[in-house]
Amino acid sequence: MSDQFSGVKDVSEHLKFDLTHLNTYLEENLASIGRVLDYKQFKGGQSNPTYLLEAEKGKFVLRRKPPGSLLKSAHAVDREYKVLTSLMDTDVPTPKTFLLCEDDKVIGTQFYIMEFSEGVIYWDPLASEAEKDKRKKIFDEMNKGIALLHLQDINKIGLNDFGKEGNYIERQISRWTRQYIDSETEKIDSMHRLIEWLPKKIPEQKYTSIVHGDYRLDNIVFDGSNNSIAILDWELSTIGDPLADFAYHCLLWHIGDISVSAASEIGIFSEKEYLENYLRRTNFKLENDWNFYIIFSLFKVAGICQGILGRVRDGTASSDFAIQMGKRAKMFADLGWEKAKKIL
């Protein structure tokens, strides 16, 4: 799996851009990095094409909207740039940002440039690339990162206007329902059942924070000592319910059906231990809503996968892996509905 996603490759033909145009723009707006001499495409990153820039003053990362017809509100690189820039002076590990370009004429779509965070990305959700006795450290760093994010004061860091406060789950159900319907390639019965069931079961939102929206192991860069140094892929970030964000992050234990004994054998925390560590770090209280949050998260990831499949249909997906990922929509929706039926 790591070979499929790790590192860079020659840029796909439909994702190439004019380097001369970029350099002309950078000369006026970001001369400090020098001229860009070459660029490659990162293998990972199915949604927003991401490039490694080889510039005169070092390596940098350019992340852009994909070309073509796009779903409304999708591929929001401007939002990524805003949240990353706001978090730069906090203890949340993020790459430094340099520039946002909203002029489509430069390389064809909006883009931003940030520092290149050199380190290790574990592409397997269980960190199988690491030795067994290192995995709990990796997972604890991951746990610490999301807790730090959820503890940020949105007013203090200037993100109070980054999204609407309250009714986060309701708005998310509406968003992913629209994305699913707009992208539907075949009717998934369990998805339609969840669309009907979820709005009736929404718990009271007790906390409000910045949420990442897609926080998982392969969106984190680690250094050689397995300290988290950069959280990536902020496209879905907004103001919302941190418990929902954390539940989405915990889908690993449900999709993989990882029991306490299995977690011990793998060398990671059980879900209960991992959840308790997060609640200890944040001092949040969780009543009896965890099952709902997990079901909602399965619905959300099904909507994301269906959106990817819709982009394959429309010819705007940026990776061959997108086809495989998109076909998982039914699996996630079916699992969510099976769990929902147990608490009807």
Task: Give, region by region, the residue ranges found by the protein language model.
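Juxta-kinase regulatory segment immediately upstream of eukaryotic protein kinase catalytic domains
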Residues: 2-33
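ATP-binding pocket architecture of kinase catalytic cores
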Residues: 36-207, 223-226
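All-alpha amphipathic helical-bundle segments outside canonical DNA-binding/catalytic cores
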Residues: 163-164, 285-297
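Catalytic-loop of the protein kinase fold
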Residues: 210-212, 217
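Activation of the activation-loop gatekeeper triad in protein kinase-fold domains
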Residues: 232-237
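Active-site activation/catalytic loop segments of kinase-like enzymes and analogous catalytic loops
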Residues: 243-283, 296-314
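Helical subdomain adjoining the active site within ATP-dependent kinase catalytic cores
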Residues: 286, 303-344
